[in-house]
């Protein structure tokens, strides 16, 4: 008898399905289809399909081998349907019943096998991607790619920044009118080149005219020489005289044409030079207008900045500084009140522990008010009698002990209260020193006092007045300077 794994190896074949025979006691059975996984998946799948009842598989395998060994049985292998028909009627009827439910189970097993195959195919790729994601963040190539990406972004940003700056500069030149001046500059450069060309043509025309004059003069001189020895002419001299006489008209016409060309070249050069000078003057005029416009804009911008500074100064001095001062005073008062409350609470706790009444600490504002009231009452000459009352703790102790004799109350001698020191406000001092004499020492001392570290106390009104006077003086000085140095 074969062992169980050997039976599995002999029985489980690719694409073969077997009908599971059951005992008569079972009501219904389900057929199963066992498919061998590909060689790549056998290591993963193992005996996944062998999880069906081993007893049923063992019975099917033994029946299969008994039929094959005897050779006379009526069972045969149905390769298309993937089932076996046995010789006994019970197995055939069970196989027929199982064929009705076999398509559903076989389709389910096929779908599960397909999903497992897809998972086995996708498994290495997903694991590879996961490993790359885990190790890719720390590899030098990853950092290099990120650095190159950042450098590309930075270079693109710089290129865009340069183009944006160029476009903004061009729009600013269009608004201020400097673009027209640039066009004038280019036109002047072209006109200068044209003037150079005209001057070159003038020189060439002069050379041609001089050559024509020399050629005609030479011919006339030769004619005169021939006329002087007219009585001794030879046939060659006669032919030469006739040729010179005929060419004299052509030389005269060439001289006239060279003279006309020279005059035209000189006229064109003069026109080009005049146009160039006009362009230079117009450029100078436009540049002066542009500089005046820029100077005017800078002046108004300076005035605007001065106005903004003065406005901010006034806002800070009128609104922000008082608010900040109030906030500081409020915070200081809150801290003082908290300290006083803590001190009163500590004194009350100490008095409760000792059985004595607590002495409350009055705030400084109440103390000053009481001192002023006492001073006013002393000035009026009113003597207000003072009565001292027994402490509540003493009264309660006497009431609780009725057997003890009640001692008469002894009024303590009033201690002389110290006279409150009058609150003297610091005198307001001016920013500028007092009027000094005209001596150099006094002026030197005054100048040093202006930059000394002497503390000055002044009111808000004086500070605002000084600020406004300074702003007005600066505006007046700037107006005078602009009126003096402004170009006419």
UniProtKB/Swiss-Prot annotation:
Residues 321-464 are mitochondrial intermembrane. Residues 101-110 have a biased composition (Low complexity). GO terms for cellular component: mitochondrial inner membrane. Residues 410-422 have a biased composition (Acidic residues). Residues 179-212, 250-279 form a coiled coil. It is a multi-pass membrane protein. Keywords: Coiled coil, Membrane, Mitochondrion, Mitochondrion inner membrane, Transit peptide, Transmembrane, Transmembrane helix. Residues 66-299, 486-488 are mitochondrial matrix. Residues 66-147, 343-423 are annotated as: Disordered. The chain crosses the membrane at residues 300-320, 465-485. It is found in: Mitochondrion inner membrane. GO terms for biological process: inner mitochondrial membrane organization. The keyword Kinase does not apply. Residues 383-400 have a biased composition (Polar residues). Residues 111-130, 343-357 have a biased composition (Basic and acidic residues). Residues 1-65 form a transit peptide. The keyword Mitochondrion applies. Required for the maintenance of the structure of the mitochondrial inner membrane. Involved in mitochondrial morphology. Causes growth arrest when highly overexpressed. Belongs to the SHE9 family. This is Sensitive to high expression protein 9 homolog, mitochondrial. The gene is SHE9.
């Amino acid at each position: 008898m074969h062992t169980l794994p050997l039976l599995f190896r002999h029985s489980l074949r690719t694409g073969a399905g077997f009908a599971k025979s059951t005992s008569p006691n079972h009501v219904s059975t389900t057929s199963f289809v066992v498919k061998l996984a590909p060689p790549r998946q056998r290591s993963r799948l193992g005996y996944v399909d062998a999880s069906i009842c081993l007893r049923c598989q063992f019975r099917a395998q033994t029946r299969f081998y008994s039929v094959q060994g005897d050779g006379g049985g009526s069972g045969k292998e149905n390769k298309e349907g993937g089932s076996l028909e046995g010789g006994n009627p019970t197995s055939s009827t069970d196989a027929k019943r199982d064929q009705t439910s076999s398509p559903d189970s076989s389709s389910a097993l096929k779908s599960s096998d397909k999903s497992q195959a897809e998972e086995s195919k996708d498994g290495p790729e997903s694991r590879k991607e996961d490993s790359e994601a885990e190790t890719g963040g720390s590899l030098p190539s990853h950092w290099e790619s990120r650095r190159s990406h950042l450098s590309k972004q930075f270079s693109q940003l710089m290129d865009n920044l340069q183009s944006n700056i160029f476009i903004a500069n061009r729009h600013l030149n269009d608004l201020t009118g400097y673009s027209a001046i640039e066009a004038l500059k280019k036109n002047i450069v072209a006109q200068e080149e044209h003037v150079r060309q005209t001057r070159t043509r003038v020189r060439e025309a002069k050379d041609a005219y001089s050559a024509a004059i020399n050629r005609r003069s030479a011919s006339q001189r030769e004619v005169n020489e021939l006329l002087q020895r007219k009585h001794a002419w030879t046939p060659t001299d006669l032919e030469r005289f006739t040729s010179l006489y005929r060419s004299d008209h052509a030389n005269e016409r060439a001289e006239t044409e060279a003279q006309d060309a020279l005059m035209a070249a000189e006229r064109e050069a003069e026109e080009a030079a005049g146009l160039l000078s006009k362009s230079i003057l117009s450029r100078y005029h436009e540049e002066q207008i542009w500089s005046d416009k820029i100077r005017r804009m800078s002046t108004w911008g300076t005035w605007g900045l001065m106005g903004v500074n003065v406005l901010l100064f006034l806002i800070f001095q009128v609104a922000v500084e008082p608010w900040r001062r109030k906030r500081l005073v409020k915070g200081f008062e809150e801290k003082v009140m908290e300290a006083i409350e803590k001190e009163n609470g500590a004194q009350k706790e100490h008095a409760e522990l000792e059985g004595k009444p607590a002495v409350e600490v009055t705030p400084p504002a109440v103390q000053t008010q009481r001192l002023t009231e006492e001073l006013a009452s002393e000035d009026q000459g009113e003597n207000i009698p003072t009565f001292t009352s027994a402490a509540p703790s003493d009264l309660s102790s006497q009431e609780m002990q009725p057997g003890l004799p009640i001692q008469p109350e002894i009024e303590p001698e009033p201690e002389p209260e110290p006279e409150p020191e009058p609150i003297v406000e610091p005198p307001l001092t001016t920013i500028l020193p007092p009027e000094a004499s005209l001596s150099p020492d006094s002026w030197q001392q005054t100048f040093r006092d202006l930059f000394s570290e002497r503390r000055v106390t002044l009111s808000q009104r004086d500070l605002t007045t000084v600020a406004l006077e300074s702003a007005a003086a600066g505006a007046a000085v700037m107006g005078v300077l602009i009126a003096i140095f402004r170009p006419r």
